[in-house]
């Protein structure tokens, strides 16, 4: 899926300057846009969110939502005792309210409020199993370009996106085992180390009506 997204983005980029000459006028003629978002941003890479936007000549507002799993494996042991492989699965969910303020035909300032969720069903520490649920709310801001083509398609590239954490909350639920203050502290620490998310070369592409 990621390769398909990158190939489509490359195709859009090649034709940006040819068919997106009047991006401002093309945006003005559209009522609704549907698309996808990806790039060098952990939440977008994992959740592959969909985009619903209401474009305008000077301002565009939108909604972003997606969910996906990040899976990793850890192998421990030795040739004499045998090897054990443990699979970790974290579910990442992206929800955003977004906007773009255009300073010309395509150059723009993207901004918005993001609500990110990271969930794990079975995190284990000292034989105590927990369910972790971490929620973060942050402000997003950046710089980018966006081209809207004569035939209805559009491509946005956010060259840089920063973030500022507004709030976060972790919910830790014991599922099995005997809980102690040490195990609970370890479970809570697992998620509260997370900082605001940022990224670069973030592609948004789709079609408008």
Kindly label every feature range from the protein language model.
Residues 36-44, 63-67, 109-117, 143-145, ...:
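Transmembrane beta-barrel strands of outer-membrane/channel proteins
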Residues 20-84, 202-209:
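Short glycine/proline- and aromatic-enriched beta-strand/turn motifs that initiate or cap beta-hairpins
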Residues 32, 44-50, 93-97, 137-143, ...:
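Hydrophobic, lipid-facing positions within transmembrane beta-strands of outer-membrane proteins
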Residues 147-155, 165-169:
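Substrate-binding/catalytic groove segments of enzymes
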Residues 58-63, 106-109, 150-155:
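Repeated loop/turn-to-beta-strand initiation elements of outer-membrane beta-barrel proteins
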Residues 91, 101-102:
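Outer-membrane beta-barrel proteins and related beta-barrel translocases across Gram-negative bacteria
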Residues 25-27, 39, 65-95, 114-140, ...:
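Extracellular/periplasm-exposed beta-strand and loop segments of Gram-negative cell-envelope proteins
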Residues 1-31, 177-178, 209:
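Cleavable N-terminal export/targeting peptides
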């Amino acid at each position: 899926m990621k390769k398909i997204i990158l190939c489509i983005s490359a195709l859009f980029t090649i034709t940006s300057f040819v068919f997106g000459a009047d991006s401002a006028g093309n945006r003005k003629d559209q009522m609704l846009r549907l698309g996808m978002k990806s790039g060098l941003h952990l939440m977008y890479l994992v959740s592959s969110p969909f985009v619903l936007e209401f474009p305008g000549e000077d301002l565009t507002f939108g909604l972003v939502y997606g969910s996906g799993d990040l899976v990793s494996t850890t192998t421990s042991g030795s040739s004499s005792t045998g090897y054990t492989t443990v699979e970790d699965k974290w579910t990442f969910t992206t929800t955003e309210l977004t906007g773009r303020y255009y300073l010309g035909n395509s150059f723009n300032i993207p901004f918005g409020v993001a609500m990110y969720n990271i969930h794990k069903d079975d995190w284990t520490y000292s034989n105590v199993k927990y369910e972790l649920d971490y929620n973060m709310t942050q402000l997003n801001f950046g710089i980018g370009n966006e081209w809207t083509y004569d035939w209805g398609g559009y491509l946005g590239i956010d060259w840089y996106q920063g973030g500022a954490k507004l709030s976060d909350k972790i919910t830790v639920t014991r599922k099995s085992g005997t809980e102690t203050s040490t195990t609970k502290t370890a479970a809570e620490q697992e998620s509260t180390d997370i900082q605001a998310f940022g990224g670069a070369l973030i592609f948004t592409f789709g079609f408008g009506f």
